[in-house]
Amino acid sequence: MDTNNQQPPPSAAGIPPPPPGTTISAAGGGASYHHLLQQQQQQLQLFWTYQRQEIEQVNDFKNHQLPLARIKKIMKADEDVRMISAEAPILFAKACELFILELTIRSWLHAEENKRRTLQKNDIAAAITRTDIFDFLVDIVPRDEIKDEAAVLGGGMVVAPTASGVPYYYPPMGQPAGPGGMMIGRPAMDPNGVYVQPPSQAWQSVWQTSTGTGDDVSYGSGGSSGQGNLDGQG
């Protein structure tokens, strides 16, 4: 009887491989890793739930996190593009904002796996490698640094990394999210990395831009003044 077609038991078939360099304990390591995946999925689900609610409530289309003039200039870099409607740069601005936010969250999850509070470029590379929708960035983001850092989650057995090029597992986004979740602060750029506040705030406070402080490090708003400055550039 041919045994090559035998299927593994459900408990083994449903376990995704952990990230490269991840260390788990020999006893209960699989359950611990599944719990980590569930927590990460809940955080991503909370992020997208809040973003959908925010988009539905938007009534200000004049001020944007990213300058529309810069986006329009990038769009016009394509010689085949002759005319651009007023709505197109607005949609691109929001799409770029969501792209940056999601990649930041996924990068922060990798930093937390490595017990760090500093988001580094190797975290961004890891987030790109483990997420198939970001595979178009693989060739422009160095991945060698991922191998240099061992993610220590506890003493025990080191699990072998997955095959190169295979995106790591995340549960489908459609799964219901449980309560709670990770919260991160606004990123502050620094030559040595992106410093992120510990997860102690609510999701709403994470993505809202404070208006009354002078030390706000969130992305600058586009507005008419920003557009005028960019239009004046060569």
Swiss-Prot record:
GO terms for molecular function: DNA binding; DNA-binding transcription factor activity; protein heterodimerization activity. Its main location: nucleus. Residues 209-219 have a biased composition (Low complexity). GO terms for cellular component: CCAAT-binding factor complex; cytosol; nucleus. Ubiquitous. Present in etiolated seedlings. GO terms for biological process: positive regulation of DNA-templated transcription; positive regulation of photomorphogenesis; regulation of DNA-templated transcription. Residues 220-234 have a biased composition (Gly residues). Residues 7-20 have a biased composition (Pro residues). Residues 1-20, 205-234 are annotated as: Disordered. It is found in: Nucleus. Keywords: Activator, DNA-binding, Nucleus, Transcription, Transcription regulation. Gene3D superfamilies: Histone, subunit A. Heterotrimeric transcription factor composed of three components, NF-YA, NF-YB and NF-YC. NF-YB and NF-YC must interact and dimerize for NF-YA association and DNA binding. Stimulates the transcription of various genes by recognizing and binding to a CCAAT motif in promoters. Belongs to the NFYC/HAP5 subunit family. This is Nuclear transcription factor Y subunit C-1.
